[in-house]
Amino acid sequence: MPIYCHYNQIVATIVTFNPQFEILEKNILAIYSQVSNIIIVDNGSANIRLFQQQLKTYTKLYWILNTENIGIAAALNQAVLYADSIKAEWLLTLDQDSVVPDNLIRTYQQYIEDDSIGLLCCPIFDRNVGLLSKSPIVEETEEVEECITSASMLRISAWHKVGGFFEDLFIDGVDIDFCYLIRKHGFRILRINSIQLLHELGHSQAITILGKKLFLFHHPPIRCYYMTRNTLYLGIRHKCFCHFALITIKRSFLMVGFESDKLKKLLAIFYGIRDALLLRKLGKAPNLKIFKSKSR
């Protein structure tokens, strides 16, 4: 018989940036009864004060309103610090457009008494392309090397040991970096395969090349910049450059070869390579004309 964590020891956070109200409320409703508190960390959205007023009947919500976009890593660190201040032991991290199953926390609770686990996660079911997995899912649980932030639940004591999320990345690769740190400090990442997160990564699309299924995400050029820069930098930071360089080459081939805005994305990739390898420049993206488009 599993020993369940006390209800007040698990809280959730949703990091927002110009969210759509209906989707955000649906996300809140999906997790509302499963946790004791929900921390909304907003990164300078123009509409957030209105949303805060519209959601005032949800008494479990705690708002952290940043005046500008400080990046996903800094926002997550704010959430963990607040969760820690109210004596929570675990924090569920969510994107603004992800809808969790109603048994997510109940399922995760079966595994949190294992002190070796620093992160719990579940498979991702993309609305457009289906299940995102590098290999067939067979076992009920599986130890994995990495997972995305959304629907992962972190042990707050593990967050303290690794030093938190790396804020210089700003966005993209923040979750991968944290996973590397978690494992370096001796914690395990356990994926629970009996549940799934309904999610949407960009404007995802599946294609087949030489019999192999590959995914396009149609991110805007600024995200291509962050993905390129941060992926290469992580290779340097974690001393496995060849691995991350191959990921960058494959991703760049797909973005430039099969997506729209090819020239802008090619330039974004170039600037990402420059800033990662030559300038070693992180933080917020430079103010370039190719980035003057709507982005998440």
Feature-to-residue mapping (PLM):
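Short, well-formed alpha-helical segments that are part of the catalytic scaffolds
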Residues: 13-33
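Non-catalytic, C-terminal membrane-associated alpha-helical segments of glycosyltransferases
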Residues: 236-296
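A short, conserved alpha-helix in the catalytic core of glycosyltransferases
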Residues: 158, 162-163, 168-201
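Conserved donor NDP-sugar-binding/catalytic core segment of glycosyltransferases
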Residues: 102-134
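A conserved acidic beta->alpha catalytic loop
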Residues: 42-51, 68, 98-99
